[in-house]
């Protein structure tokens, strides 16, 4: 349903005022605080229309109006293009580039803390997921005559290691040749790139040690598919300072929610680009009274993880969207820069 310019202006002004003050907004408030060439009666009629259309609602204890989730959605959809088209000053890039590529966990923690400080809300940063990482290198270290320790490294510094049985008559040189061949064929591939046809080629190339190849691929697939979630939180108390969360039951639910890393990872893992979920658009009941702004960050042009900011539906969307978009961009730039300088 389209809104004429007058209704749009009134709706946006009410939302902006409510975000700032957390108090219902009435027609007299609008005429006193803002420049409207309209009478209070006309504004009241327009507000009544906006309420009938589902963009505003009236709390029982007030004559003023507050935005509904539909009102916020209209407001946010108008904002996103505008926020992303305005160049932002550098916020975090210098700090991120001080870390080495293998210090990805530190990078994630720094990003979470910075996001919370910049927005005054709660931040969530999903670290690089192994399933979205690219294979970097296999290394093997002899344990005894029947076993080697196989170490797998991804391009994001994630390391997995497992002991692997080998035939006792395999020389060090033969083992080295096998590892070199696997590295040559697999480097830069994600788990989805390792197709049945590629596995068939590897078996043919290394027919004498098919068992070792099979075990290596099994470890690789296991490591990529079953890695644990890595979610960093920042400012968990920030959201609890908002007036919407004075209810002790809500507070307990949120705090319990923040402790479940797997659930947090699930909430963030489907996000690519800039996404804003408002209220009941969120899939989890614990955050049905919240809004979540997320953006993905990338390495080598592919989505690697997600950063997010969780706050009340009365969130300062314009500021949060701009900050989240900028930090995601800077995190991508920092990771790409490390990739280039450390290769």
UniProtKB/Swiss-Prot annotation:
One GO biological process term: negative regulation of DNA-templated transcription
NCBIfam families (alphabetical): hrcA (TIGR00331)
Organism: Natranaerobius thermophilus (strain ATCC BAA-1301 / DSM 18059 / JW/NM-WN-LF)
Keyword DNA repair attributed: no
UniProt name for this protein: Heat-inducible transcription repressor HrcA
Function: Negative regulator of class I heat shock genes (grpE-dnaK-dnaJ and groELS operons). Prevents heat-shock induction of these operons.
Secretion signal span: none
Top-level taxonomic group: Bacteria
InterPro entries, A to Z: GAF-like_dom_sf, HrcA, HrcA_C, WH-like_DNA-bd_sf, WH_DNA-bd_sf, WHTH_transcript_rep_HrcA_IDD
Upper taxonomic lineage: Bacteria, Bacillati, Bacillota, Clostridia, Natranaerobiales
Family label: Belongs to the HrcA family.
One protein family per Pfam: HrcA
Keywords, alphabetical: Repressor, Stress response, Transcription, Transcription regulation
GO molecular function terms attached to this record: DNA binding
